[in-house]
Amino acid sequence: MRAWRYNAAMTQPISRFPVPRLDELPEDIRARILAVEEKAGFIPNVFMVLAHRPDEFRAFFAYHDALMLKEGRLSKGEREMIVVATSAANECHSCVIAHGALVRVYEKQPLLADQVATNYRKADITPRQRAMLDFAMKVALRSAEIEEADFARLREHGFSDEDGWDIAGIAAFFGMSNRIANATGMRPNDEFYLMGRVPRAR
């Protein structure tokens, strides 16, 4: 079985903590990781890093899926835009790179993720998406200042209060994820850098 201590280039460790081998993992976690590999063509390092703590792995991805895979007014691309903007504010290299790739894939705009990460206010986004990211950034950086006027602005752009909860939940969840990634020294896969920029190899 493969060892995942190092990234694809085999030059830097993907975590400062021990990274388990696939054959050491509980069956449910191994099955999930292999399913991701089948779909993506590689195993994102976040799965192997978090698998160091199986119970927390399960809890993390259960909440992740509840936020990111649910039906609602937020598209998959918009959810990922929230992750990229707030992760950039939290200076999480791993999350910006990995989720920036998903923004490019879902939105089919190769420049958008970089724009959102560096200054979403100047990105090629709609007024609705600007309002969404303004709210997400306030949750990420100044949540104690959130008031009814913030929800009123979301409503002006067609969001419901439940959508506001979704935006807040994503910003808050990935605030935790950013900090875990930074504390563990998690590195993004090399594959993420080119996703959505060049055609996927067949």
Kindly give the residue locations of the regions a language model identified:
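Hydrophobic alpha-helical segments
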Residues: 2-202
